Amino acid sequence: MKLTWITIVTTKFEESKEFYRDFLGMEPGAAFSPNEFMDIAFFKDQNGMQVELIWSKKKTEASDSDHIYIGTFFDDYSKQYEEAKKRGIIKSEPAPQGPTNMCFVVKDPNGVNVQIIQPK
């Protein structure tokens, strides 16, 4: 099994694209509008895993995403932490995550939790 992508339906399309592109450093991929009520954009990490953002223009409220977490590893963990502090998006400060990793959590514009993980 190979997990290919995670889909997030958003009411904050532009802010979400900026977060995944500029903060997480994901590469923009396919982007299209299958109809007049929807825009879709994909963002890919260095291993090929993708986040699919769907903006349904008919949807005005986001659903509860507090129980969703996306885990990401960063070689320059300190740089990501400083950028997250600057943006004011930290949900939880760095803490040990198991015996070998450190982790802090940020919120994307949709309220999805993104774990920023550094191997010890």
Over which residues does each language-model region extend?
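Short hydrophobic/aromatic beta-strand element in the GNAT-like acyltransferase core
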Residues: 40, 50, 71, 103-105
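Short, charged/polar surface micro-motifs in flexible loops or helix N-caps
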Residues: 46-50, 58-60, 77-78
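Core segments of cupin and vicinal oxygen chelate
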Residues: 7-48
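Vicinal oxygen chelate
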Residues: 31, 42, 81-120
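N-terminal beta-strand motif that seeds the catalytic metal site of vicinal oxygen chelate
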Residues: 1-17, 68-72, 120
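Short amphipathic alpha-helices within nucleic acid-binding modules
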Residues: 19, 78-83
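Short, charged/polar, Gly/Pro-enriched secondary-structure boundary elements
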Residues: 48-51, 62, 111-114
